[in-house]
Structure formats: structure tokens, C-alpha cells
């Protein structure tokens, strides 16, 4: 007879098997009404699943993260229910949960229009408002296959044939006349699935293979209540205003074009931001004692075969040939850095050796995945590799962690989630090697009192890694930084040093990137600041404007003076009204506008305005220069008088 232990340590004794819903009802009708699922001995189960033995039980509600994920998954099934009613010949493929929502890939003999999506969402609401029960049945593999074969669901049959063992018992979930297959759990009743919205459609190949049929992917978002849904939609609206592609065009930062998909054409102002970011990173490299190097753009395929990249990464690599030799354009910098390390005999006294590069890399990303600066084919990594002894690993990883937090704080990013990615199925190196590498990273994080979670199986094929995900002002996650141990690549490329015992040893290699892709990070910053870059990063920091022609000479003198002081400044001497000039440069997000009239010429001062519309009044020119230099030098996120 099961004894159920609840999270508060209390126990309930039963003389028969019980479900999480039974226990919730036993505790109280309010909890039963809120019960979505249960966690039994750490495993999520449906509210109706029976517990036959002693167990630890937590009741999952919409307030739990798992509860929200279940709601989203059930909304995907609701979408399937609705689309089969509207277009009965639709074939259903897969419908997983994603960040903030769900999607379903469908095979439909018509291209869905916006009107179709609206009709589909309306039908989903009509069905959800019926508050029908979702019925779960565990059936044999053969019964599941027969069920979907009879319904013409060829994609579900394919999943059963290729992904589910014949002795398994798949879970079928019945939404009235509609049936879907899933590991679950799902909501017990559709009253939990009232707060959703369909967002967009896109194309997607079956199983992600371009050789397969193109399906239609329908994206949706779902939340536990109306307030949360509306808040999310408002964040999306704000995100659209901050879209770096839109702002990049408004501020003339860069452009992309069809002749070079995924490659950035940097304009002067955008390249100014890029170079200023490089200056900042270089200052940190000097502070943390890195040396900067530059490797070639492409190397012989033979080298990439030695590293293991060719076997694991060749589909993402661009290749070319010359004089009967095949070359790979580098997708990453690490093999080149090992070649530099290998030049000349190294001693243990030379370690740690910290080698950094602004490496120009190229990856053959699918054209459909390209997205402005966020997903490109040609990008620059703020990449570094540290060669060290095993005894130095902990100190070096600690240094990397400090550098990550040091740099992110400069941009105002405070919420950082850390994950430790462990060995994937497809990997190089021994299990003992992976055990040691994973333990070293975990200990370094623990010593820095940094909370982290494991991502099982998500490491790179050559070593485990720490991933740093920062959250922006809209609470969107951006995975940028990595610190990754590699016990394999140096030995593959014959890297060695002479140890204290005068024997040759293989160094440990630590891969380290903080901003990740410079292009992507500029995209993130553009959206984080909505184009209002902090003064130190702004392409033009000051515009000096005249009111009439009589102040032109004074404006030119001031422009030269500020430029000599290291400030990026422009003069606007156009024969336009001063209000027009101020509005134009405000729209260009120029941090400071200095206005010069006859009064300013006579007094040797300037009238200072910020792009936020704040009038700082008349100020001495030297005082303005001194304050701006301090703001720029300190890389402050705030402007004067803020």
C-alpha cells in the first residue's frame, strides 16, 4: 500500500494505488482544481497516472515552470485538434514546446494565409472553452501504429517505426475525436489552455533534412493567465521597436544583400562601434595578460581531419581548392592557435600561455536561419585559447569567469545564467578524460559561488564547457560566453611542453569566448540600448550646431578642439532651423548636441542638450570636454546629470 511523502515532509497512507489528482483532492478541492500533473520521485507524470508504491510526490500547478511547459505542450495538441477540424486531410508531424510557446509542423495541401491562422486560432479558442477532459491511454506499439495508419498520419507512423521500440507502450492523448502521441504529461482538462496566441508560420523540412518534404510550421505562445500573455505580447511589441535590423537601417550602421547572404557590409558608423568594441576587449586582454595573434583564414583539409572537425563539422564548413589541394575556410580559431603554440620549444615555465584573436570565421549556416547580425555566415570571434598544465586549470578557469563578469557588467548585464554542458554521445576522447574535465569546471564554478545547472549531453565533441547566458532588458536570453576544457585537441596536433621532470607533456587547452560573435553582440547591444548606445560606444558622440551663419567659425573651432580631445564630433552648419537639426540628431541617437548662438560665441560657452531632451544649460567648453572625457574613459552607461 503506497505511502505518499509530500514536499513538506508530511505523509499520506493509502490502501490502494492513487494518482496525483487523487492526492491533490485528498488535500483539498482547491489544489485538485489547480493540479496539472505530478512529480513522482523526480519524474513528471500525468495527473491520472497511478502510483502503486511508496513515493515522493509534488503536485504541479500552473504556477510551476513545469506546469507552464505542460500547458504549452497541450496547446500544441489543441492546435492539432483545431487544424484537423478545419482541414481534415492535414498530416501532423511534430509539435514540441519551445521558449515561450510551442509549434507544430504540418503537411497541408494549401499554404496557410494570415486569414487561415486567424481562423485556426479562433477554432482553438472555441475548443478550449468547452473545457473538455484530455484522456490518456497507454497502448502497445502495434495498436499505436494501427491507430495512426488508419488515420493516414504517415509522419506519426514514421516516428513509431524509426524512434520507438516495439516493446514500448506509447502514450496516446485524446482530445475528443482527435488523437495525438506523446511522452507527456499533458493537462487533464482544457480549462488550463485558454491563454494563447498563434504568432507566425514558416517552412521546415521534415526531420530538419533538406532532402525531405518541406512542411509548414505554425508557431504559438501560451501562458498560465491572461496577464502573463498580455505582458509577453507587450514585450514582443517593444522588441519589434528595438529590432536591430530596423535600427541598423535608421542609424546607417550596416546592410546585408542577396549577393553575400549572411555577410555584413559595415558602414562607417557601424564599423566605428565594432572598432570601439575591439578597443574595449583589447584593454581587457592586456589587463588579464593575454597575447594577441592572427591566424590564416583557411588551412589544408588534412589539418581539419587531424583535429576531428572534418568528421564532426564538415557540413558547416566552406571549402575551396587550389593546385590539387583542398582547403577549409576556418569555422573556428583553435587549430590555428595550436599551430602557433607549436612554433618553438615550450617549457612549463612558459605556461599558462593565453592566446587571443579577433578571428574572422565562416560557417555554412542554412539560408533560412540567417537573421540580421544575430545569425550570420561570416563573423568575428573574440576568441582565446589558454595552454596550461593540469595543476593550473582551476586558476585559469577562475580567471576566465572573472573576465566574463567584468566585461558583461560594463554593458549593464546583471542577470547571467550559467550552465555546465557535459559529454555528448558523439565525442572524441576517453571517459576518464571527460570525467576529469567536467569535474574541473564544476569545482571552478563552486569556488566562485556561482550557481549553475547541468546540460547533460550538450558539450562540444572535444570537451565539456561552461555557458554564460545573459538576459537583456526584455528578459530575453542570449548565450554568448563559453569556457571549455579540451584534453584532446593539443594531443591530436602534437602540442607539447617540457615539464619539470624534463619529460614532454601535452598541455591542457581552454577555449574561451566572452562576447561570442562580435557581430551578434553588436546586434544584442543595439536592441538592449534601442540604438541609444552609451557615449563611449556611440558612433558620433557630439554634434555641434550653429543657429545662423555668424557662428560657423566658432562651431568649426569647437569641433576641432573636441576632436583633438579624442571625442567623436561632427559639425552641422546646414542652413536649417535649429529645431529641425535637434530633432534630426535626436532621432540619430547622438548623445550630446551643443548649440551655438551669438550669446555662446560672446561668452565662449555652449548650450548643452542630451538626446533624451534634457537641457543642461550653458556650460564652459573646457568643462564639457572634461566631463565627456571622463564619461567616455569610464565607459559609463549614464549621461551627464543622470
Curated annotation (Swiss-Prot):
One of its GO terms (molecular function) is aminoacyl-tRNA ligase activity. Binds 1 zinc ion per subunit. It helps recognize and select the amino acid substrate, and thus has neither a purely catalytic or structural role. It is found in: Cytoplasm. Disruption phenotype: Essential, it cannot be deleted. Zn(2+) binds at residues 334, 385, 511. Residues 2-241 are annotated as: N-terminal region which includes the editing domain, important for catalytic efficiency, its loss increases mischarging with L-serine, deacylation of incorrectly charged tRNA no longer occurs, partially complements a deletion strain. This is Threonine--tRNA ligase. A number of inhibitors with high affinity for bacterial ThrRS and less affinity for human ThrRS have been identified that might make good antibiotics. Inhibited non-competitively by borrelidin (BN, KI is 3.7 nM) which binds in a 1:1 stoichiometry, inhibiting L-thr activation. BN binds to 4 distinct subsites in the protein, preventing binding of all 3 substrates; BN also inhibits human ThrRS, and thus it is not useful as an antibiotic. Its main location: cytoplasm. Changing residue 363 to A: 700-fold decrease in kcat for Thr activation, 1000-fold decrease in kcat of aminoacylation, no change in KM. Changing residue 465 to A: 35-fold decrease in kcat for Thr activation, 570-fold decrease in kcat of aminoacylation, no change in KM. The gene is thrS. Keywords: Acetylation, Aminoacyl-tRNA synthetase, Antibiotic resistance, ATP-binding, Cytoplasm, Ligase, Metal-binding, Nucleotide-binding, Protein biosynthesis, Repressor, RNA-binding, Translation regulation, tRNA-binding, Zinc. Residues 63-224 are annotated as: N2 domain, the editing domain. Homodimer; binds 2 tRNA(Thr) per homodimer, each tRNA contacts both monomers and makes specific contacts with the anticodon and acceptor stems. It is an enzyme of class 6 (ligase). Residues 1-224 are annotated as: Correctly edits mischarged seryl-tRNA(Thr). Residues 200-219 are annotated as: tRNA acceptor stem binding.
Amino acid at each position: 500500500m503506497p505511502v505518499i511523502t509530500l514536499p513538506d515532509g508530511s505523509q499520506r497512507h493509502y490502501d490502494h494505488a492513487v494518482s496525483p489528482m487523487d492526492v491533490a483532492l485528498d488535500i483539498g478541492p482547491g489544489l485538485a482544481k489547480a493540479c496539472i500533473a505530478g512529480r513522482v520521485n523526480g519524474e513528471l507524470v500525468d495527473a491520472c497516472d497511478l502510483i502503486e508504491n511508496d513515493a515522493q510526490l509534488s503536485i504541479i500547478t500552473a504556477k510551476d515552470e513545469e506546469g507552464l511547459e505542460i500547458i504549452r505542450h497541450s496547446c500544441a495538441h489543441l492546435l492539432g485538434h483545431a487544424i484537423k477540424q478545419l482541414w481534415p486531410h492535414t498530416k501532423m508531424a511534430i509539435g514540441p514546446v519551445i521558449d515561450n510557446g510551442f509549434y507544430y509542423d504540418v503537411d497541408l495541401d494549401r499554404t496557410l494565409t494570415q486569414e487561415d491562422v486567424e481562423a485556426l486560432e479562433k477554432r482553438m479558442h472555441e475548443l478550449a472553452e468547452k473545457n473538455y477532459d484530455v484522456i490518456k491511454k497507454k497502448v502497445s506499439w502495434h495498436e499505436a501504429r494501427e491507430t495512426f495508419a488508419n488515420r493516414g498520419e504517415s509522419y506519426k507512423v514514421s516516428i513509431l517505426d524509426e524512434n520507438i521500440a516495439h516493446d514500448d507502450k506509447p502514450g496516446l492523448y485524446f482530445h475528443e475525436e482527435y488523437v495525438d502521441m506523446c511522452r507527456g504529461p499533458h493537462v487533464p482538462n482544457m480549462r488550463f489552455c485558454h491563454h494563447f496566441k498563434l504568432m507566425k508560420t514558416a517552412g521546415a523540412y521534415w526531420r530538419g533534412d533538406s532532402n525531405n518534404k518541406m512542411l509548414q510550421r505554425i508557431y504559438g505562445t501560451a501562458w498560465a493567465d491572461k496577464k502573463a500573455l498580455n505582458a509577453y505580447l507587450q514585450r514582443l511589441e517593444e522588441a519589434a521597436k528595438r529590432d536591430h535590423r530596423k535600427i541598423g537601417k535608421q542609424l546607417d550602421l550596416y546592410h546585408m544583400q542577396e549577393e553575400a547572404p549572411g555577410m555584413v557590409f559595415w558602414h562607417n558608423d557601424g564599423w566605428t562601434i565594432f572598432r570601439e568594441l575591439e578597443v574595449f576587449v583589447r584593454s581587457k586582454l592586456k589587463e588579464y595578460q593575454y597575447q594577441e595573434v592572427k591566424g590564416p583564414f583557411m588551412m589544408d583539409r588534412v589539418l581539419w581531419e587531424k583535429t576531428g572537425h572534418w568528421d564532426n563539422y564538415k557540413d558547416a564548413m566552406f571549402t575551396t581548392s587550389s593546385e590539387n589541394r583542398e582547403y577549409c575556410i576556418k569555422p573556428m580559431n583553435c587549430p590555428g592557435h595550436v599551430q602557433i603554440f607549436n612554433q618553438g620549444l615550450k617549457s612549463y615555465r612558459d605556461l599558462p600561455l593565453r592566446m587571443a584573436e579577433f578571428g574572422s570565421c565562416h560557417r555554412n549556416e542554412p539560408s533560412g536561419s540567417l537573421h540580421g547580425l544575430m545569425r550570420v555566415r561570416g563573423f568575428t570571434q573574440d576568441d582565446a585559447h589558454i595552454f596550461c598544465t593540469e595543476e593550473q586549470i582551476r586558476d585559469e578557469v577562475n580567471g576566465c569567469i572573472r573576465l566574463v563578469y567584468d566585461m558583461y557588467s560594463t554593458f549593464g548585464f546583471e542577470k547571467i545564467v550559467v550552465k555546465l554542458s557535459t559529454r555528448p554521445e558523439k565525442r572524441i576522447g576517453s571517459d576518464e578524460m571527460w570525467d576529469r574535465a567536467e569535474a574541473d569546471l564544476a569545482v571552478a564554478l563552486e569556488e566562485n559561488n556561482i550557481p549553475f545547472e547541468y546540460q547533460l549531453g550538450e558539450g562540444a565533441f572535444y570537451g565539456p564547457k561552461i555557458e554564460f547566458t545573459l538576459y537583456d532588458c526584455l528578459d530575453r536570453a542570449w548565450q554568448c560566453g563559453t569556457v571549455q576544457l579540451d584534453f584532446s585537441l593539443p594531443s591530436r596536433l602534437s602540442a607539447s611542453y617540457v615539464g619539470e621532470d624534463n619529460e614532454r607533456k601535452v598541455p591542457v587547452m581552454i577555449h574561451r569566448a566572452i562576447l561570442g560573435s562580435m557581430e551578434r553582440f553588436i546586434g544584442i547591444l543595439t536592441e538592449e540600448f534601442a540604438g541609444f548606445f552609451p557615449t563611449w560606444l556611440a558612433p558620433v558622440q557630439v554634434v555641434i550646431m550653429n543657429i545662423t551663419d555668424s557662428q560657423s567659425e566658432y562651431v568649426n573651432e569647437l569641433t576641432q578642439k573636441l576632436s583633438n580631445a579624442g571625442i567623436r564630433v561632427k559639425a552641422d552648419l546646414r542652413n536649417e532651423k535649429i529645431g529641425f537639426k535637434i530633432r534630426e540628431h535626436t532621432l540619430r541617437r547622438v548623445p550630446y548636441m551643443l548649440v551655438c548662438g551669438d550669446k555662446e560665441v560672446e561668452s565662449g560657452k555652449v548650450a548643452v542638450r542630451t538626446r533624451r531632451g534634457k537641457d543642461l544649460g550653458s556650460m564652459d567648453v573646457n568643462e564639457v570636454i572634461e566631463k565627456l572625457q571622463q564619461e567616455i574613459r569610464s565607459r559609463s552607461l549614464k549621461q551627464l546629470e543622470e
